[in-house]
Amino acid sequence: MDAMKYHDLRDFLTLLEQQGELKRITLPVDPHLEITEIADRTLRAGGPALLFENPKGYAMPVLCNLFGTPKRVAMGMGQDDVSALREVGKLLAFLKEPEPPKGFRDLFDKLPQFKQVLNMPTKRLRGAPCQQKIASGDDVDLTRLPVMTCWPDDAAPLITWGLTVTRGPHKERQNLGIYRQQLIGKNKLIMRWLSHRGGALDFQEWLAAHPGERFPVSVALGADPATILGAVTPVPDTLSEYAFAGLLRGTKTEVVKCLSNDLEVPASAEIILEGYIEPGEMAPEGPYGDHTGYYNEVDNFPVFTVTHITQREDAIYHSTYTGRPPDEPAVLGVALNEVFVPILQKQFPEIVDFYLPPEGCSYRLAVVTMKKQYAGHAKRVMMGVWSFLRQFMYTKFVIVCDDDVNARDWNDVIWAITTRMDPARDTVLVENTPIDYLDFASPVSGLGSKMGLDATNKWPGETQREWGRPIVKDPEVTARIDAIWDELAIFK
């Protein structure tokens, strides 16, 4: 992988501007609903990232739509094009289950991968740009940040791109996660993390090891794109997101110790929120419009108390909105889809392609094509998708087709479903499985069912009937008609 070089978010914005991928908005625009309207229209048209230089009522510019096209996601991951993300996936598959060299020649073939791994360790700085300006105590005021209100019935302004940094009591490695945070006071946010996410797991372990003690948390806003994307990529549990970001960027990730705790944050981030979660301090979060296109239920989550705000000079506030696809999470899903394919193929070599349609809210429906080898094979692949990567724990529907079907063409997929499936025989229903908390269609919050559709050709043992043979054109006839097609002038 030849990394597209940039050091921090500002470098990346310069790169985008040089390629016509960034638009500066000088007209005053309100972070309350108006920025969402403009960003939504721009994203749906495949437009540029937007830097609102004069948000109404605030002195800090707002960056939106940063990852609004698959190309910009690829650029953030150090690549020129989305197709190159397959190489990122191959590297992750290698790191997840590295294979020792089989000989001297194989060692040389693997050297590029080992060389990339050497870029992984972080570089710790004594001082950093993210600590150029410091507010603490009574000077902490989150209302000075141009936090967006995205939809008319949202409960309050919402931080959407907060890179949350935590560490469990028994872990050397920090966890990075993107969790939305509702603004409820000058120094108070609600930390909405689901129970299986890394930050929530760190918090639960802390409560068990240090009952009654405050849990240190830091949040980075405006980190460099590689670090942000590292937090939403299926990085192996043994690898830190910072290390993976360094791999993407081609240089070690620079971090700095926080002022009030021992957590390490991206040194070049625009803004850092430092603070703690008081055990037992909870608050009702929501409702908010989310990536499903609906407002979610109100539920209680921990309160994050901010004790310090540090930031760069002339800091930029990075934000987004979530709504019915297409939105930024859906675009991220399209790009990261290419990363997932090699990881799945390493575990299941029979998989030819894997596709998460963006209209399926990024992860709720998956289409898999495979080289089927035996009766029941499609069901094995279904179960593998649900269990191998935790990113697909919430995937409700898995459709499995043969490799003569294009997973990314609904015409092909629907044809396979309607001609190769018997609804009773080829539908797999699994009850009482983990489901996204935001999925109000499930009968119980966080618990619901899954459906697998086996749309493959059936083998002996799966059917007693003679199976249909697909129609295939005679290639000689096709060639003869190709030769006279223009002469026929049918469409002239």
From Swiss-Prot:
GO biological process terms held by the UniProt record: ubiquinone biosynthetic process
Descriptive protein name: 3-octaprenyl-4-hydroxybenzoate carboxy-lyase
Family according to the record: Belongs to the UbiD family.
Enzyme class: lyase
Membrane topology reported for the UniProt record: Peripheral membrane protein
Subunit structure: Homohexamer.
Classification of source organism: Bacteria, Pseudomonadati, Pseudomonadota, Gammaproteobacteria, Enterobacterales
Role: Catalyzes the decarboxylation of 3-octaprenyl-4-hydroxy benzoate to 2-octaprenylphenol, an intermediate step in ubiquinone biosynthesis.
Active site: D290 (proton donor)
Name of the coding gene: ubiD
Annotated GO MF terms: 3-octaprenyl-4-hydroxybenzoate carboxy-lyase activity; metal ion binding
Any one Gene Ontology cellular component term annotated for this protein: plasma membrane
Organism: Salmonella choleraesuis (strain SC-B67)
Named cofactor requirement(s): prenylated FMN; Mn(2+)
Cellular location(s): Cell membrane
Gene3D superfamilies, A to Z: Single helix bin, UbiD C-terminal domain-like
Main location class: membrane
One matching Pfam family: UbiD_N
